[in-house]
UniProtKB/Swiss-Prot annotation:
The chain crosses the membrane at residues 325-345, 350-370. It comes from Escherichia coli. The keyword Membrane applies. Residues 1-11 have a biased composition (Polar residues). It is found in: Cell membrane. This is Colicin-N.
Length: 387
């Protein structure tokens, strides 16, 4: 390493080793060779056009392309950049950053490149009340924290933690994070669609099973609710007050007065739910359901469902689902997770009247967040479902 290159390799969060273009314009090479003066080390820059390998691959990874600029004109002298003695930016070069979700830890990504060391091997990403927060782990005890309010790259803030040495221009960080934001957006959309499809299948299957006891009207409405869930992509849930108002109309139906034996049986069914086991079942349905604290979310649904049946107060249950979205879970994933938990409730051995209550309440919870008209349809069939 040159004398200034060694310091840059240590102090530059997005440089080091053979990093081709995410670091300081000077790097770990020796002085004296020609280098392109393009604002990126050694002629590397982000691709302005989509590359054939850009985007998602079948293995779940995401590829971002950077390349050497053929039009860059080498200047004599100066720092040769992170690639040592190669200062000629005129030759065409293409590289890729590969980002792979870590399935063992929601929100963590493994970043790698087959040819060059990258800015960080691990990236943690989370959404907190509309703000994207990224932590780039560079070396033990050192990391770079990037905060992007409202996913607006122009509001980006970069903090260097336990960092010694000079800070560099954040332009290159911004360019990478803007690409990573695009990746995260596409990933969320894929996960939401996957979750909604899986949840709709579960609710439809539950409707078929309960329909054997509750009749064809219930089965048909349950399928309509399942279809509503499948097509919920990109939408927001109704507010707590709106959802509660719709649910109260169902609860006010005289047929929804639950007798003690049915209530005890339903509460006992919820008490049998093992949150960890159910979380494992749901998590195995696909990447979409691998959300943080899944077992805790299942346990909250279990506790607040029991509270609802025991006290008649269903507000805490609906507020729980709303809190997931406030905490950063995409609305479609929240609805899907809620539907999956409700669909996995063990119902064997329950009386038909208890099954009727569970069946009506399940589709009513879900529809109260999605469509007031669907809740009205549910209310209209209660007399034929619960006898």
């Amino acid at each position: 390493m040159g004398s200034n290159g060694a310091d840059n390799a240590h102090n530059n969060a997005f440089g080091g080793g053979k990093n081709p273009g995410i670091g300081n314009t000077s790097g770990a090479g020796s002085n004296g060779s020609a280098s392109s003066n393009r604002g990126n080390s050694n002629g590397w820059s982000w691709s302005n056009k989509p590359h054939k390998n850009d985007g998602f691959h079948s293995d779940g990874s995401y590829h971002i392309t950077f390349h050497g600029d053929n039009n860059s004109k080498p200047k004599p002298g100066g720092n040769s950049g992170n690639r040592g003695n190669n200062g000629d930016g005129a030759s065409a070069k293409v590289g890729e950053i590969t980002i792979t979700p870590d399935n063992s830890k929601p929100g963590r990504y493994i970043s790698s490149n087959p040819e060059y060391s990258l800015l960080a091997k691990l990236i943690d990403a989370e959404s907190i009340k509309g703000t994207e927060v990224y932590t780039f782990h560079t070396r033990k005890g050192q990391y770079v924290k990037v905060t992007v309010p409202d996913s607006n790259i122009d509001k980006m803030r970069v903090d260097y933690v336990n960092w010694k040495g000079p800070k560099y221009n954040n332009k290159l960080v911004k360019r990478f994070v803007s690409q990573f934001l695009l990746f995260r957006k596409e990933e969320k959309e894929k996960n939401e669609k996957e979750a909604l499809l899986k949840a709709s299948e579960l609710v439809s299957g539950m409707g078929d099973k309960l329909g054997e006891y509750l009749g064809v009207k219930y089965k048909n409405v349950a399928k309509e609710v399942a279809n509503d869930i499948k097509n919920f992509h990109g939408r927001n849930i109704r507010s707590y007050n709106e959802a509660m108002a719709s649910l109260n109309k169902v609860l006010a139906n005289p047929k929804m007065k639950v007798n003690k034996s049915d209530k005890d049986a339903i509460v006992n069914a919820w008490k049998q739910v093992n949150a960890k086991d159910m979380a494992n079942k749901i998590g195995n349905l696909g990447k979409a359901f691998k959300v943080a604290d899944l077992a805790i979310k299942v346990e909250k649904i279990r506790e607040k469902s029991i509270e609802g049946y025991n006290t008649g107060n269903w507000g805490p249950l609906l507020l729980e689902v709303e809190s997931w979205i406030i905490g950063g879970v995409v609305a479609g994933v929240a609805i899907s997770l809620f539907g999956a938990v409700l669909s996995f409730l063990p119902i064997s051995g329950l009386a038909v009247t208890a099954l009727g209550v569970i069946g009506i309440m399940t589709i009513s919870y879900l529809s109260s967040f999605i469509d007031a008209n669907r809740v009205s349809n549910i209310n209209n069939i209660i007399s034929s479902v619960i006898r």
